[in-house]
């Protein structure tokens, strides 16, 4: 036998036995290396101490619950929506116009066409709270105090809180206040009056009440051409009849065609009609024969 072969085979056998012992025994692991500690750089001399950041101040809130920076835009949008609703309601005999200087002030006038206050023309001003629609109800003051149980004889203010004790957002609207101001002249309420004299006369002496109402209407009519109490370009004012100005406008109003008539003329009727005009009987229209 070759001696080199016997030596190599012996060494291989010893190495295999050693590996078996190593596998059969516990697995030896090397001890973990300790990582070097991180050190912060030294603080330079004359360095100022670091102060903790202050917590941000809470966002300012406006009176209507929105962010203060959005408050004016939210209020303007709310008032624009309110005025749009007033226009869509088409309140009979009631006309309003927002002020040029403040959207919180509206000028208006009410025309009474029948009843105890017939022929009355009453100018008024609506004052809207600056925290609308989360505040109280708007105030309505007549330019000239009207003789009425619900109108203060000194200030001319209408008792609006009677109908809107608590203004409810998204439920109450300004057009309802205007409708209420119109309704009080047709349906008289004398409970808890602002003008006790008017309430007593309405209950005890209706003829004297009517006489004072007629006098009040005459006073308002006589002062109809007075300058507005508030100097504003959009304030409602009346002027005497001027033919050079008003005749042309009246003619246009009288000759203006109704929307229904214009719509009917613009509709193209297709096909033939076998119904005689003014009749509902089928085939009542006589057929014209062509001579041959």
UniProtKB/Swiss-Prot annotation:
Residues 14-23 have a biased composition (Basic and acidic residues). It is found in: Cytoplasm; Cell membrane. GO terms for biological process: apoptotic process; early endosome to late endosome transport; endosome organization; endosome to lysosome transport; lysosome organization; postreplication repair; protein K63-linked ubiquitination; protein localization to perinuclear region of cytoplasm. GO terms for molecular function: ubiquitin conjugating enzyme activity. The keyword Protein transport applies. Belongs to the ubiquitin-conjugating enzyme family. FTS subfamily. This is AKT-interacting protein. The lineage of its organism: Eukaryota, Metazoa, Chordata, Craniata, Vertebrata.
